[in-house]
Curated annotation (Swiss-Prot):
This is Cold-regulated 413 plasma membrane protein 3. The keyword Nuclease does not apply. It comes from Arabidopsis thaliana. It is a multi-pass membrane protein. Residues 46-55, 101-104 are cytoplasmic. InterPro entries: COR413. It is found in: Cell membrane. One of its GO terms (cellular component) is plasma membrane.
């Protein structure tokens, strides 16, 4: 019986959010979270043994994450936690290069990018996805999809070969997010 009460409360909260912000904003917010999770997943997947022979250039995911990371996570990384992680990254990289694993290069660079970027430049790339930030996300995701599709031998092969399906789905999610968020931006102009 308590489970039903929790579901009713969640439904009421979701209804209030949709009523106050609107459906396009909620869809954009959901897609922003999903795209960020997928970008982190691809970054992790690229450093594991499960990856296939096509290197997806995970370094391009750093600017994508910078411009599409949800504001809550971005502010946490930009303030206290991110500064400590960036400091540890720099110390390990400079003074203990043998102990700094190669798989930590791109995540460390992403955290450094988030922490070190000046507020004015960060606002240009983050606040409005219709302009610069959206362009970065769209161009990055388009390049990654194009490279992945060519390496697979076409769109059909990228979805039929079992070792490439995960990459294909994740890259298409990264591509759909900036397009749908720009369409959603038309509704609240």
């Amino acid at each position: 019986m308590e489970n039903i009460e929790y579901l009713n409360e969640i439904q009421a909260v979701a209804g209030k959010l949709i009523h106050s912000y609107g459906v396009p904003v909620m869809i954009t917010l959901f897609l922003r979270w999903l795209a960020s999770i997928v970008a982190v997943f691809l970054m992790i997947l690229d450093q594991t043994k499960w990856k296939y022979s096509n290197n997806i250039m995970a370094s391009l995911l750093a600017p994508y994450l910078f411009s599409s990371l949800p504001i809550v996570i971005f502010q946490v990384l930009r303030n206290g936690v991110g500064k400590w992680i960036a400091l540890l990254t720099v110390i390990l990289r400079l003074f203990l290069p043998n102990h700094f694993h190669e798989s930590l290069e791109i995540p460390g660079a992403t955290i450094l990018l988030i922490v070190v970027t000046p507020s004015d430049i960060g606002a240009i790339f983050r606040d409005d996805l219709r302009y610069t930030g959206g362009d970065v996300c769209l161009l990055t995701s388009f390049y990654l999809i194009n490279k992945h599709t060519k390496a697979c031998g076409g769109i059909k092969n990228s979805f039929t070969q079992k070792d490439k399906v995960t990459y294909s789905i994740c890259l298409w999610i990264l591509f759909v997010y900036p397009i749908l968020s720009s369409f959603a931006a038309l509704f609240y102009l």
